[in-house]
Amino acid sequence: MIKDPFERLGLDREVLTVSQLNGRARVLLEDVFRSVWVEGEISNLARPASGHMYFTLKDSGAQVRCALFRQNATRVRQALRDGLAVRVRGKVSLFEGRGDYQLILDTVEPAGDGALRLAFEALKEKLGAEGLFSAERKKPLPAHPQRIGIITSPTGAVIRDIISVFGRRAPQVELNLIPTAVQGREAIAQIVRAIRLADSLGFDALILARGGGSLEDLWCFNEEAVARAVAACVTPIVSAVGHETDVSISDFVADVRAPTPSAAAELLAPDNSGLRQRLDGLQRRLLLRMQNRLTHDRLRLESLTRRLRHPGERLRQRAQRLDDLDMRLRRAFMLNLNQRRERLARLDARLAAQHPGRNLKLLNQRLDSLAERLPRAMREVLKDRRQRFQAQLQTLQVVSPLATLARGYSILLDEQGQAIRSAEQTRNGQRLTARLNEGELLVRVEDNHLTPVTLSLLD
């Protein structure tokens, strides 16, 4: 044994740097504790990409850090995990960079299941057999909560993260903190009292939250008293304990488990952008339907225009009129839609100061009604315009000179193609053209007195 380690290391008068002190302390520890066996329970196990393992070995009264390097880790047969009771062998050393006292291990043997893990599995099996985890017991979360109770520590990042999520997504929701300790033996009774108090205050939903930590740090959420308080809660409750990889008994009993406290807030924070997205979707659908219908009618009109050669100018005017109505209808539709979007934006701006949950259903119903009425109104307008167009087309066909020829009349034309309206425009022997409904005749004037003209067909 070393009777005077300071004398041996030359520390009686020498002034050392921190690095020198840590280096000599490491040498001293490794010289005295070259190989020791220690039994305890693993916690805070870490496996970096290097293949080394780092964890804390603890018992009920103390803990020590351990390092198991890759060449020795490959020889460990037992899969290591938090809560596992093990017996380890190694040398006592010092990590000089931080001045941390630690064990450098060469052997790890199982010493039976960890007490905490055994207690966890036993309680999980017991409560599961009672049906406390069944899906039939789970209560649905409210779609648009107005008041939410948050059961967590009043300090730390958890409450700030939850407030931040609600401030960003749903600032109109009222948040109420029910403070409690979230670690240690005294936290168990506090959490139970906080759950019962929150359940009696008429909140729309509750969040039971805590940040990450070791199995021991989170253990109060694995206690039977806390689990039964969660199960007895009438208000829908979300359990958000630890990180995504952490699982607690309260997660199984709660109505919904969230991987993190921020995720729990997102589950309960209604997204006000959803209504705007729905309106934009309806706008796109209505515009597409309107464009398809107008394109179909325009193509049909163009087809009719090509088939009706007379009177072409009137048809072109009607087509232009229809295009004008089309553009006016589009402008009116866009004006109406923009007005409704502006009104929705104003309502959205008031959400932060008011509670819009009561009016949200009414606004959705009104929006659905408008979405159903607008295509029907458009079809009625197009139908009326089409009927008026057909009526005017029939009127044009009645007064057309071609209709007169079809009833048996003819038109006399002179050599220059001018219409003959009086006998005075002709002379005896003059050759004329008689245009009929179908074909033409070449005729000659026999007598051009003011009495009816006598015509004869030319040989």
Swiss-Prot record:
Record key words, sorted: Cytoplasm, Exonuclease, Hydrolase, Nuclease
* Location, primary (coarse class): cytoplasm
Per UniProt, subcellular location reads as:
Cytoplasm
Looking at the record's lineage, which domain of life comes first?
A: Bacteria
User: Which InterPro entries does the annotation name?
Assistant: Exonuc_VII_L, Exonuc_VII_lsu_C, OB-fold_nuc-bd_dom
Q: Which Gene3D superfamilies match?
A: 2.40.50.1010
Report the catalytic activity: Exonucleolytic cleavage in either 5'- to 3'- or 3'- to 5'-direction to yield nucleoside 5'-phosphates
One Gene Ontology term, aspect cellular component: cytoplasm
Does the record's keyword annotation contain Cytoplasm? Answer: yes
Q: What is this protein called?
A: Exodeoxyribonuclease 7 large subunit
Gene symbol here is: xseA
